[in-house]
């Protein structure tokens, strides 16, 4: 799940890397800073990175990007099953509740969805 961004030079390339890694992965803030062609991870740069990720359909955890270049972040494609599960956890709705229950109970979800939900619970819980 670690994203190797050695050859990635654009946000579109980052999106492609996520697709190759099952729509989810983790990387360091220093790599995102470099992708953004910034020198530092100040508040404005972090906000711009978040906006650019969003423009490409990429979500991130934690919701507020950290300013430490060594901090690890999780990236996911928003309009995918894993993205929908993460959104269901972070932005509760009735539909999201049904999605979560279905993912863990086997109703409306498969084993892969249940495993992704387990991973999401670990990430959101900080474990």
Mark where each language-model region is.
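Long, compositionally biased intrinsically disordered regions
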Residues: 1-2, 82-127
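Extended alpha-helical scaffold and adjacent linker segments that couple domains
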Residues: 2, 27, 36, 56, ...
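Positively charged, polyanion-binding regions of nucleic-acid-associated proteins
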Residues: 5-30, 34
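Charge-enriched amphipathic alpha-helical scaffolds
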Residues: 13-14, 33-34, 38-67
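Generic secondary-structure transition motif, activating predominantly at the C-termini of alpha-helices
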Residues: 18, 22, 36, 53, ...
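Residue-level signal for secondary-structure boundary elements
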Residues: 22, 26, 44, 57, ...
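Charged low-complexity interaction tracts in eukaryotic proteins
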Residues: 54-95
């Amino acid at each position: 799940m670690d994203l190797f961004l050695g050859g990635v030079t654009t946000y579109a390339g980052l999106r492609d890397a996520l697709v190759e890694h099952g729509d989810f992965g983790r990387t360091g803030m220093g790599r995102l800073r470099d992708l953004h062609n910034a020198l530092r991870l100040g508040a404005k740069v972090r906000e711009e990175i978040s906006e650019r990720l969003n423009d490409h359909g990429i979500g991130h955890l934690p919701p507020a990007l950290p300013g430490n270049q060594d901090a690890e972040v999780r990236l996911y494609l928003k309009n995918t099953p894993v993205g929908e599960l993460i959104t269901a956890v972070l932005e509760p709705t009735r539909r999201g509740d049904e999605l979560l229950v279905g993912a863990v109970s086997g109703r409306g979800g498969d084993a892969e969805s249940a495993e992704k939900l387990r991973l999401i619970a670990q990430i959101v819980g900080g474990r």
